[in-house]
């Protein structure tokens, strides 16, 4: 393997000649061969947005030449294009401030920027610390890149997937509004409900999650940049943080602002905890929806079988013809993983000691994973399951007509105790509810027909 020699304050080190990173990235790569979880490329893109904005801000403030500013902006745009992904090899499991990933970006930006300057016959050169990292610290850059990445992924991936599934459920809600079925509480028969009403509960869960997500993501717009090492802003111009936030907003289209308290921004990540709490709530709702769907689709002959779902693949390696609710199982596993991630994010966020929380990479990794799992899970569940949900009306009608809980409609006419006697007699003697009611003498056939109307029970008002 062809190598080149790079150096840092620890001395010289060999780096692969075809890679753009420098000495500190190479040391991290060698010192932390831990796990397979690479630092998410979206964090790198968040850094690139930050370094780009910082270069422009430093130029505005007279701290960087125009040539250097242009070179750094060019390098950052190259990173944002996705052309340089291979040059960011570091794993999540590194220093808790994310210093090595910050330096990985600084070194790659410096390398590409220097090529740009050389191509433009400039005598200037870019240093990863003195120029790319000017007015910054890893302590304020990593949380800034984290917030930029999280906000963008919520906007571009999670929210569209949530809307997609929500809209499908709304279509099913409207389509099945005339189908009356038996409701169930405590896994036992209850009073009737429309299939559309049942699905409306699922849909409204997603409506509420969309609202909560919209609220919680607003806090992610606060950026730590400008706090530098401990929140005081040492080595940065007083206007630097605001300017960087402005330029990040200008390039992304999102209204980022510089946090009003940088001490908080470096040592606390409660804003991410709140965001992930919303992800956990969404996971809980998706767990409920997926479980309801697979229970209602259970069978085909010895289950509830009130709805059918698409048959996507063989379900068993031993039982011929078996088809399983695999999309529901996928979504419930996604939900469980997100709930586990929430524990990690909450605990890691509580570990800020004095002026810095040093669990930033694991907070970032778990939150991004939750966003991707939920987004992919909802889209896949929608396309391969939800769109194909159809009622099995014969079974729905049979369960409705056999249910003893229709007796509830007699309560206002004969009282709770007599109605209970009718239900118990029917269950014990294997009678229909109508037969039992007439045999007790509490109601006539005409009264039963007038009072027991499922269509009235689903819309009593």
From Swiss-Prot:
Pathway: Carbohydrate metabolism; tricarboxylic acid cycle; (S)-malate from fumarate: step 1/1
Residues binding substrate, per UniProt: 97-99, 127-130, 137-139, 185, 317, 322-324
Any one GO cellular component localisation term in the record: cytoplasm
SUPFAM superfamilies in UniProt: L-aspartase-like
Catalytic activity: (S)-malate = fumarate + H2O
Function: Involved in the TCA cycle. Catalyzes the stereospecific interconversion of fumarate to L-malate.
Protein name per the record: Fumarate hydratase class II
């Amino acid at each position: 393997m062809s190598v080149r020699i790079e150096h840092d304050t620890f001395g010289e080190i060999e780096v692969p000649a075809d890679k753009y990173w420098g000495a500190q990235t190479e040391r991290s790569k060698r010192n932390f061969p831990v796990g397979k979880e690479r630092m998410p490329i979206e964090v790198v893109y968040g850094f690139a947005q930050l370094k780009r904005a910082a270069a422009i801000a430093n130029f505005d403030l007279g701290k960087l030449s125009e040539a250097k500013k242009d070179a750094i902006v060019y390098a950052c745009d190259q990173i944002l294009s996705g052309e340089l992904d291979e040059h960011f090899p570091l794993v999540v499991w590194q220093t808790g401030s994310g210093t090595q990933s910050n330096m990985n970006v600084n070194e790659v930006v410096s390398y590409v920027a220097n090529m740009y300057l050389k191509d433009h016959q400039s005598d200037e050169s870019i240093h990863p610390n003195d120029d790319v990292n000017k007015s910054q610290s890893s302590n304020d850059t990593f949380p800034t890149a984290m917030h930029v990445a999280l906000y963008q992924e919520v906007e571009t991936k999670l929210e569209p997937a949530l809307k997609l599934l929500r809209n499908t459920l709304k279509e099913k809600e409207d389509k099945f509004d005339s189908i009356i079925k038996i409701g169930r509480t405590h896994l036992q028969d209850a009073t009737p409900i429309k299939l559309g009403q049942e699905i409306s509960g699922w849909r409204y869960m997603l409506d509420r999650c969309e609202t909560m997500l919209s609220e919680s993501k607003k806090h992610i717009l606060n950026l730590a940049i400008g706090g530098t090492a401990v929140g005081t802003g040492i080595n940065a111009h007083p206007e630097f943080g605001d300017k960087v936030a402005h330029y990040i907003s200008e390039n992304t289209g999102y209204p980022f602002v510089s946090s009003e308290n940088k001490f908080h921004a470096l040592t606390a990540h409660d804003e991410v905890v709140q965001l992930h709490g919303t992800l956990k709530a969404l996971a809980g709702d998706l767990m409920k929806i997926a479980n309801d769907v697979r229970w209602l689709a259970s069978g085909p002959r010895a289950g509830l079988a009130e709805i059918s779902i698409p048959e996507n693949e063989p379900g068993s390696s031993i039982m011929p013809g078996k088809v399983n609710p695999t999309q529901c199982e996928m979504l419930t596993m996604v939900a469980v993983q997100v709930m586990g991630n929430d524990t990690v994010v909450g605990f890691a966020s509580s570990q800020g000691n004095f002026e810095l929380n040093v669990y930033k990479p694991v907070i970032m990794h778990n939150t991004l994973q939750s966003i991707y799992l939920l987004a992919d899970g909802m889209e896949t569940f929608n396309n391969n399951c939800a769109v194909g949900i159809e009622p099995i009306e014969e079974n729905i009608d049979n369960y409705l007509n056999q249910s003893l809980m229709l007796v509830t409609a007699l309560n206002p006419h004969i009282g709770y105790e007599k109605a209970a006697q009718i239900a118990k007699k029917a269950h014990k003697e294997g009678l229909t509810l109508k037969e039992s009611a007439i045999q007790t003498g509490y109601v006539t056939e005409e009264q039963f027909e007038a009072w027991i109307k499922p269509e009235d029970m689903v819309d009593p008002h």
